[in-house]
């Protein structure tokens, strides 16, 4: 009886440990760097900036929002979004966020989002290797 209880407790501990593991920054970068580089080539958004935003917005890929929506950048629905969405508590309860089938869809939409918004247009005049100017520019643009 004691052996069965011990084995059960060990099994529960192992299962809990496996499911409770979180993604590190390094793991996030390794997992998504190829998509970010591809998007940099396609759109001009620096891969370092894209990855940094993804890390911050998703807590390295561990946030509830990214797990239920593949939304790596916290992009909300707004009035023009007609695709799938999820409800998530953010600045206000039950806000509408875009939902993606894959992380790659989220990365592509992020690049397109920046390229098509007038208040981000000045960023594309910057050197794509100048991550500091891009970071300050994104902060300035809001």
Segments (PLM) and residue ranges:
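Bacterial Sec-dependent N-terminal signal peptides
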Residues: 1-24
């Amino acid at each position: 009886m004691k052996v069965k209880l011990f084995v059960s407790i060990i099994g529960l501990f192992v299962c809990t440990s496996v499911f409770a593991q979180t993604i590190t920054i390094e793991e996030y970068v390794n997992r998504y760097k190829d998509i970010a580089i591809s998007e940099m080539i396609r759109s001009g958004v620096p891969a370092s900036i894209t990855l940094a935003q993804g890390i911050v917005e998703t807590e390295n890929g561990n946030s509830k929002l990214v797990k239920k929506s593949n939304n790596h950048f916290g992009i909300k629905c707004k009035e023009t979004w007609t695709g799938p969405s999820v409800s998530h508590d953010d600045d206000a309860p039950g806000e509408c966020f875009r939902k993606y089938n894959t992380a790659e869809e989220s990365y592509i939409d992020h690049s397109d989002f920046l390229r098509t918004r007038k208040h981000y247009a000045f960023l594309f005049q910057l050197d794509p290797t100048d991550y500091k100017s891009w970071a300050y520019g994104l902060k300035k643009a809001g």
